[in-house]
């Protein structure tokens, strides 16, 4: 499996803590490159795929340490960039593979047609094709949220602190 796992921890915070962190972080860190100038955040819409038994959802709710999710993502309600993603979680480590989709390819996926994925040479196209054909994955859930992400270079990688604002 090509790629590099990254460490990911998530914490729930209350509104007051959010504003304190936001104030402190904005003085020390840069906003993520995807942030809109006028608001400092960006909108994410994800369409998740699952099987008829909702296996991916069940493993998430159960808190299983190893699981995967397949999704299509757009940013700021625009379809100029459409990403097909496979996210694998093993304990607190995350591996994400992503490839671009055209609007036409996205529409084909919505119709259950995925053979075009075999022509793509980037991960996760093959894994998504396999999952749709052999596990019966189909689009099931849309999730919208707004992200305020700060970035700080550490060695070669980046640390992202995401503050969901909705």
Where are these regions (language model features)?
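Acidic, proline/serine/threonine- and glycine-rich low-complexity intrinsically disordered segments
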Residues: 155-157
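Conserved small/polar residues in nucleotide/adenosyl-binding loops
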Residues: 159-165
